[in-house]
Amino acid sequence: MKMNSKMGLALLASTALLGAAGAAAAAGPDFDGIPQSRRPPASQPYIGGAWTMPTRPKAVKTVDGKEPPLLPAARAEYQKRQADLKKDPKTDPIADCLPHGPLRIFYNQYPLLIVQESDQVDFVFEANHTYRFVDLTRGPPQLNDDTRTSTYMGYATGKWQGKTLVVDTMGFNDKTWLDGSGLPHGEKLKTEEKFTLKDANTLEGVVTITDPDNYSAPWSTSFTLKRLANYQPTEMVCVNDHKM
């Protein structure tokens, strides 16, 4: 895949900010490596820096603590996956070093870095070198506007609604699970993520899942990320016998 100029700039900014992520938590925004013209306005909440999820449930529930509204065929597939996992944990797609995919990527045990710019927000996950670029200059993603194909992490666009970053993503393939227990999804999956800074060191995420092939209605789940101080990233390379 050819890297466009925005991706290149984002990767450069990500590299520059990795070393300063810990300092940013204590000293406020650190925009080293980001040109002045691309820095977010001072009035915008600063979600940049390193984050981790202190509590990582294996099975994702809805915001009211219930099982997602699976359709009959999806429920049968879910139950099969759970039975297979009991027999052999390596039936999990990530055992073959595949990306975690949507939603589940936030529940892995490795930290992530958020790079915040005026026109783009980038999520750089230590897990398996996974990254997401969220374009803030376009409307909701449309797959029929070019030659895009389905991918593990989809195509994301975002916007700020007051103090909340709203990210719309679609264009996923169906090769990943939504959580560690085997929740399925298909290629019609669309996600809406809302990220709200609750305080300087707490970021709340609310994700709404819409997938008419697997769920009878849209459903939402939530999680909490905590800012990391003195974060020193390490290289995380998946190998066939690696447990993520």
Q: Language-model segments: which ranges?
A:
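Bacterial N-terminal signal peptides that target proteins for export
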Residues: 2-12
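PEST-like low-complexity, intrinsically disordered acidic/proline/serine-rich tracts
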Residues: 24-244
